[in-house]
Amino acid sequence: MPELLTPRLRCSPLQLDDWSFFLSLQQDPQVMLYVADNRPIADIRAAFDARLPLWSPKSSHWLCLVVRDRQSHTPLGLTGYCHHDDDIAEVGFLFAPQAQGLGYGYESLCALCDYAFSTGGIRRLTASVTAGNQASKQLLLKTGFIQEGELRESYWLHGRWHNDWLFGLMRHDYQ
């Protein structure tokens, strides 16, 4: 399983002892505003457990990496991707409120893209972002993703339908 290193970060596979951090992200209204409604702990635990099995480049489950400060080992967020086709994968990321706006998302997403394109056998990365989530949109654009479209009223969240913004990044376009 990959471990990605950047000057400030260590991104390593989710482990059993990451449960409390995973739960704290999933229960934080600010973090989950554009992601999901409140869920029972049992549902969050099922999502956590689904990300624990050993991952390899052709796995059908999410590669889930805990983004940590490289010196203090403090967990800051999660990043990863999931294959949808042979050489296409969807990226995702969540960061704790205190870790937002400090460049950790960009640094870890660049490391993830580097890995996906150089080692993971990925030709195309995609992302789906709930419309209105400007921070995620800006992060994806800064990383080189292109907004390719918008799905109207495609995601049910907080009691109403929301549009989804669709992003893509091709290996040959990635710098």
Residue ranges of predicted features:
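Short loop/turn motifs at secondary-structure junctions and domain boundaries
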Residues: 55-60, 145
